[in-house]
Amino acid sequence: MKKRFEGTKSYVATEDLKVAVNAAVGLERPLLIKGEPGTGKTVLAEEIAKALGAPLIQWHIKSTTKAQQGLYEYDAVARLRDSQLGDQRVHEISNYIVKGKLWEAFDSPVRPVLLIDEIDKADIEFPNDLLLELDRMEFHVYETKETIRAAMRPVVVITSNNEKELPDAFLRRCFFHYIKFP
């Protein structure tokens, strides 16, 4: 993916925004986009994916979202139920692992754009809980004892409505751009 982002027919980007996007893409660091609601932060990720010819994987964050959900979730209740019903799938623990959006991005055979939308809605520790995974582009699945590594490092676009401050350690790892209200 050697294409550069120059905006699209439906998204007019400022020069500063183009520089931020292309720096993040080229240097493989997350791009943090802040701005008021309705300024086009989420649409920007969609347009970056279109311009680069990349699939878009969207992870919309809520106040209850935990970082672990982006990696995977282990459904122990379903496994217990299946064991009581004599289901043979119970012997393979991977049958009860539900892949999260980061895993989906890491599994992509082509370089995707991963949108982590409205990160500031989550708990204050949420961004720090993703630092290692976003830096190394890998994580460990404890239940199956396997390490999941990104096949292609995704273009990571993170949006924030500036509702709360993000941790300094997280901010230092991102390229940043503020979109002003038109």
PLM features: residue spans?
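Conserved Walker
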Residues: 119, 136-152, 163-169
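Short glycine-rich substrate-engagement loop in P-loop NTPases that contacts/grips substrate
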Residues: 71-109
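Dynamic helix-loop-helix/coil hinge segments at AAA+ ATPase domain boundaries and subdomain interfaces
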Residues: 1-18
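AAA+/SF3 P-loop NTPase mechanochemical coupling elements
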Residues: 96-97, 103-111, 141-159
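Conserved AAA+/SF3 P-loop NTPase catalytic/coupling segment centered on the Walker-B
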Residues: 100-101, 106-134, 165-167
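Phosphate-binding P-loop
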Residues: 13-15, 22-28, 36, 105-109
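A short helix-turn-beta junction within AAA+ P-loop NTPase domains corresponding to the substrate/partner-engaging
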Residues: 54-58, 167-182
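Walker A/P-loop
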Residues: 31-77
